[in-house]
Amino acid sequence: MSLLCVGVKKAKFDGAQEKFNTYVTLKVQNVKSTTIAVRGSQPSWEQDFMFEINRLDLGLTVEVWNKGLIWDTMVGTVWIPLRTIRQSNEEGPGEWLTLDSQAIMADSEICGTKDPTFHRILLDAHFELPLDIPEEEARYWAKKLEQLNAMRDQDEYSFQDQQDKPLPVPSSQCCNWNYFGWGEQNDDPDSAVDDRDSDYRSETSNSIPPPYYTTSQPNASVHQYSVRPPPLGSRESYSDSMHSYEEFSEPRALSPTGSSRYASSGELSQGSSQLSEDFDPDEHSLQGSELDDERDRDSYHSCHSSVSYHKDSPRWDQDEEDLEDLEDLEDEELPEEEELEEEELEEEEELEEEELELEEEEEVPDDLASYTQQEDTTVAEPKEFKRISFPTAAPQKEDKVSAVPIEAPDVSKGIPKAATPEEKAAAECAQEAEPPKSEESFRSREAEEGQEGQDAMSRAKANWLRAFNKVRMQLQEARGEGEMSKSLWFKGGPGGGLIIIDSMPDIRKRKPIPLVSDLAMSLVQSRKAGITSALASSTLNNEELKNHVYKKTLQALIYPISCTTPHNFEVWTATTPTYCYECEGLLWGIARQGMRCTECGVKCHEKCQDLLNADCLQRAAEKSSKHGAEDRTQNIIMVLKDRMKIRERNKPEIFELIQEVFAVTKSAHTQQMKAVKQSVLDGTSKWSAKISITVVCAQGLQAKDKTGSSDPYVTVQVGKTKKRTKTIYGNLNPVWEENFHFECHNSSDRIKVRVLDEDDDIKSRVKQRFKRESDDFLGQTIIEVRTLSGEMDVWYNLDKRTDKSAVSGAIRLHISVEIKGEEKVAPYHVQYTCLHENLFHFVTDVQNNGVVKIPDAKGDDAWKVYYDETAQEIVDEFAMRYGVESIYQAMTHFACLSSKYMCPGVPAVMSTLLANINAYYAHTTASTNVSASDRFAASNFGKERFVKLLDQLHNSLRIDLSMYRNNFPASSPERLQDLKSTVDLLTSITFFRMKVQELQSPPRASQVVKDCVKACLNSTYEYIFNNCHELYGREYQTDPAKKGEVPPEEQGPSIKNLDFWSKLITLIVSIIEEDKNSYTPCLNQFPQELNVGKISAEVMWSLFAQDMKYAMEEHDKHRLCKSADYMNLHFKVKWLYNEYVAELPTFKDRVPEYPAWFEPFVIQWLDENEEVSRDFLHGALERDKKDGFQQTSEHALFSCSVVDVFSQLNQSFEIIKKLECPDPQIVGHYMRRFAKTISNVLLQYADIVSKDFASYCSKEKEKVPCILMNNTQQLRVQLEKMFEAMGGKELDAEASGTLKELQVKLNNVLDELSHVFATSFQPHIEECVRQMGDILSQVKGTGNVPASACSSVAQDADNVLQPIMDLLDSNLTLFAKICEKTVLKRVLKELWKLVMNTMERTIVLPPLTDQTMIGTLLRKHGKGLEKGRVKLPSHSDGTQMIFNAAKELGQLSKLKDHMVREEAKSLTPKQCAVVELALDTIKQYFHAGGVGLKKTFLEKSPDLQSLRYALSLYTQATDLLIKTFVQTQSAQVHGGKGTRFTLSEDVCPEMGSGVEDPVGEVSVHVELFTHPGTGEQKVTVKVVAANDLKWQTSGIFRPFIEVNIVGPQLSDKKRKFATKSKNNSWAPKYNESFQFSLSADAGPECYELQVCVKDYCFAREDRTVELAVLQLRELAQRGSAACWLPLGRRIHMDDTGLTVLRILSQRSNDEVAKEFVKLKSDTRSAEEGGAAPAP
């Protein structure tokens, strides 16, 4: 920085003398100075001005103005580049410059002028040379400094990648003070915005406009001119900023501050800088070394202005014993050269020794991890460092004492790389290395010189020492010594005082990635202690800070704000123009213009009196002291003393608590109380401070212009000093970044910051003449100076000045304060943190054994009460006195509580606290539209610190919730409430992230809790699985004998038994129930998203299912357990699923898997169950048999065996049913297998009953067979019920088919049993029917019965029915009682058939031979009569039986004899009428009025139909019967198949199909002829030949062919012809013709030819060989044809034919009938010499 001196001498104007009344303004950087106004065309001002210059790329603007009545006009201007201004310590004659009329602008800055005028001005401008150091001495020191630089360059440290450029010496400077570091003062463009907390850093803007630097000049009104940002990357920039390189990863804008290391009288320097974003942490290099070049161009300006006020510089040691008052250095003389050299050489030697020591120590010590992990652990108190006289090294002791780390500033930016070895070594050196000896020697020497009062040290030596110390500091830092050597009080950069309190330098860069064991250990520690102490208790070990806070606390409490004296205002009349002390507005009016305090004399508007809240007594004391009113002052002091005594007497507990909290001895406390009282009495008279204010930016301002915008600028006033910023045109969110410096000597002063809208119009010009402020008011904020300390970056809401003000928005200020005597103290916010944390530690850990004592407070502000009454008053008064916001108090208390968040009741308090913190930041007010994130970013607590605190708290809460069952046991209602509050706290953290941090999608609290619950359940399941037997034995085993220890190898599941799984299910249920009943009501904040009971069931089931599935697969391979055990386990699993899992949304619409696990075991059980059921069946039948098949009850008609069998089956089915298998496919498998079991069991029952049933029927016990039939029917009934129970129509198709098939089989069995039972009555019925026949034969009378004889017929019918009715009546009555209805009907049907068939074959159609043969015939024949037909269907068995009967009687001749011998049994018409009537009676009897068989069944019964048909045939003539036979019997030989027709007998056709047993064929030619006149029909038959005859005989075979015509009305015609016989020919040729005459009344369809091949035998009857039948209807269309007829062994006929044959067989007197019977009864004779013919 250089000092520019400008002398405005005189000017020459072109114009009249009276025209000019001119003054000159000088503008450079952002400072404007103005001369007085002088009249005339050749004015002479002769005024000198001085400016601090830190940028030589700008220019000096000189403007000459002519003063006017309303506004001023510019005469001309000239722009002088600063680079062209000479350097000299002497004034020159000046230079005449021509004024131009216009300025040339570039980027809103003047860069030249144009359009010359005729006016000229004489100016003398020069830069003052720094000191008066001789050239020779300057060269000497430059050489020495180069040697030191060379030493530094030889040391290979981590920033060697990009060395600083050589420092050129411009020719215009006699000495380049960049060598000494003074040219490098604006080395940190980031210092104003970048707090160590990163609280006030803008995270979104990387394009903040260039900064504006301001320096204070006497008599200068402050205007603004921008300067370009200072270059980056100097060595000093690094040396001042080693503490901040953990923030490199954050891109940030250049800082607005331009504070100099050595500021002018009105300026407070920022002192230290921070490494800019251009520093590359990976390459450890500084990018760009333009700073040196720039600094080369800056000249040193004034030793006075650069040294005397630079108390905030790190190169200014504040220890009084180390450094004299710097202002006195101006007058010190230069020491002797020899002394200087000697000292310098000593220093060099010590540096070299130190360098060697450091190189030896570069290896990383073993305990480096203890440092690198200090982010999470408290660092032990390091060794005391001796204070070094170097300004940069001096604060080392305080730093090490207070090196309790807080947090890396920005967790969200990611963890930086692990520290390099050089950094680790540097850190170790910073912790362990003893300070060099030279420090103590130099320090002691300097102290001695100060004590001896030697004033010989000159400015040169002082400056050289500073340069020397700076270089040495750089060397130390390069080796790592200076890394941690910054003091807590170090004022470098914004928030420099917070460097140790609120951040952890180098931690994020240096901390290596922890090992797994480290992580595990840290988790264990976090479980015990909560959040790490680095976040919660950063000041407990900082004794120096605690000592200071102790004093400040006493000061705040001995005379608290709440006890201050208010002003005594009264209405006051001003006699001269007076301005309001508060708003600086004129007190308008003629009289009674405002208010005046009678005590301290402050004047203000009536509306402003409430804004003046400073203590009146102290203001009065200050004022009277300054004005010499000592008596008045003494009175005030006495009042103050009394008040403090009263305070101490009334509230002794407060001061006792303070003493105990800070562990101060009683004597020291007493002394300190006296000192504090005296400081209060001294008041503000001895108080002074330096204030540096950076106006950063504003947001959301009011629009005052018609364009909808404003042109805002800011005025800052401290006391009577007022400065302003540059105007930002047309912007409601302006950015100024301008820095102002003030001196303040009154702690009751206020900083008044006003935002105004610049108006450049006539109205504004006029207003300017009458008002101090002609511009529109946009808002203001008033800041009490007493609330400032250290550095702070704060957003202030803009307030109204009057009720009419339209104000909105907020302004951001960076304020740095140095209070005399407290230069090294931390900001009040840090001091408050120290107080609060120590108080919390004392109250919680010391007094209450680590348990947080929660105050009992109620009301809306209860959350602001942190302690009991005494402790709360301490923190509140401290906060009130020193301007600590309540939100800062809340955040600090939240941080303290975070270390005890697991203590009872704490989560609820933390949740409430955070909710109110959220509300404070997220709920913006109407007066500002600043976003929540911006408001939070401006938090004095530290944005990154609080975010990291929440992040770490969030992680810890998640870990604790992941073990909620241990940390919050369900047995403790208090802990359950804490659990609920913990979730509320998580919700508040989520709200904070979403609303305050404005993160896009932070993890939802409900999801976080859900994940934690699942994690806990996973671990819980694993625990109970691994310790199942032990836990079960402890919790549920009541039998002491069973509580034996389970061997470790049997702790888990076994394939030998299933006990483990049953116990595990019990434990799982207990877990789910606990979650359902205890934790679900507790964690009810998210009813739609989180239900702990349901999640518990879901997780437990999922894990259990996985293990159970694998276990069952293993069991399936070995099958070592009983199937019943598997079934029992299946039921337990089913219950578990249905009770807790089935209704869960995840499983609701899914088919569960568990039935599939047990399917093999259920099938196994069903297999075994079938065997059991069969055994049970046999046992039941045996018991039933022994008991005689007794009815189970009076109303039950079946015996107990059926009940027993189905009871067992139903029990088995109930077990399957109770499985409630939800898988339809598996249910189908079960049903199929069980259906087979049912089928096998019931069929076996039916088989056993069927085998023995006949034996029961043979006995005279009708009851037992009936009960057995009832049992069979009951099987069918119960089967139907079981079918419905198993699903009915919904039953599996295969199972359903099995059961239906079983039902059919049982039905057939019942039919068979009924038939057997009815057949047992056959002998009795046949006997009764014979008796009926006998009675019937006695009925006399022939012909039709007249109507008059009906009564006699009825009587006869009754007589005939008597025998059978007696039998039926006696049995059917019994059957009706003991038979099931269905069984009864079946028995009745069988009896009905038996009665009908017996009557038919005994009465209507008596047998051809004995009764046995006829009975057999009819029985077999009866089977074909069930289809309900009027004409009986074809059935060949009857004919065959007649033939067989004939064969049994021997030859046909015997049959004829038999028939002749039989009495004529043909029924008369009357007898037929009697039989008809009897049939009706029997039918009515079997119907039994609806109780028995249905009438429709009886009417359509084929047996009745057959009987009636036979009766009807009795009345028909023989011809009609024969006609009926021919028309109905179309399949008498080979089923009517095999017959072929040709046109000529010469053509032999192929063999016919359908002939299964061919015995030959015969060829005949038949021709039909009808006489056209008479209608007489003739048939000519030509017997051609016989072929393939099959016949064996012992004698000569002499075959011949006999042809018979069969039909009606042939009694008078020839009916038979025969050919001649052929000897021994089996294919004889005959060629003989015969002619038959037929009746004209019947057509060919009524006739047939029967061809019979016979073997001629002499003296005996011819033997029949084969038979064939040709029905003439087949020739009706042909007329004539050659017929090939297959020969058969016999004639086949159906029932009709058989009936006709039997009726005709009884007509012994009718030749035609006898012939017909013989013809149709003929059959193949027995062969001789061979086997008998097949039947």
From Swiss-Prot:
UniProt keyword terms in alphabetical order: Calcium, Cell membrane, Cell projection, Coiled coil, Cytoplasm, Differentiation, Exocytosis, Membrane, Metal-binding, Phosphoprotein, Repeat, Synapse, Zinc, Zinc-finger
**Membrane topology summary:** Peripheral membrane protein
The residue ranges of the MHD1 domain are 1106-1249
Q: Where are the zinc fingers (Phorbol-ester/DAG-type)?
A: 566-616
Q: What is the effect of changing D1655E?
A: Loss of binding to STX1B and priming activity
In what ranges is there compositional bias, type Polar residues? 203-224
Q: Where is this region: Disordered?
A: 185-458
Official protein name in the record: Protein unc-13 homolog A
The species this protein belongs to is Rattus norvegicus
User: Gene that codes for this?
Assistant: Unc13a
